[in-house]
Amino acid sequence: LKNIKVIIGGFMSIDGKTAPANRIGRIFTKFMTPQHQKILHRLRASVDAIIIGVDTVLADDPSLTVREVKGKNPIRVVLDSSARTPLTSRILNTEEASTIIVATQKASKEKIEALKSKKVEVIVSSSPERVDLKELTEELKNREIKKVLVEGGGEVRWSFFKENLVDEFFVWIMPYVWGGRNAPTLVDGEGFLKTEDAVPLKLKKMKIVKDILILWFSVKR
């Protein structure tokens, strides 16, 4: 089915949180040196597409372009069931990279038309409620996209793991403790309830860059 490499990754505090409990975004950006930025942007430049969920657009308003290194800009793909991406968001107003919004049947025609007016492509998934990720990866494969980076957030990462679509997983562990029982974690969703259902990983490489530990895993098949 697949023939498309899916890499998932993200940043978390030493206690596994990706943001404080109030979920105010972009919290790790301030801890990153130019050296860290280069590593991240080199990774972005190496993939054909970046996938994020609409919640990440709403919280962080990222541009998802390659800035710190030379390289191509990947296609930006937003999973947005109800077409909630704001028309003012950076992802719709930066022309260096093309954008695809993936909505579902529950998105209103008006919202879809408004997004199309921003000269972005809108794909409507056949699924009524949530974007069908297997269908999406097939669609991307048909466009000759071979390598995808899923940047988040926690619900999106969970959906890819649940559908058994992940090939590689990287984690940046930041030297901070956030705490917060309701703070978001790297992979959220309902979670696996049995040990045998958990996703097994194999550590491929690790490196420390100015107090940030970067771990890179492959998913055991």
Regions found by a protein language model. Name each.
Residues 1-221:
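Enzymes that bind and transform nitrogen-containing heteroaromatic metabolites
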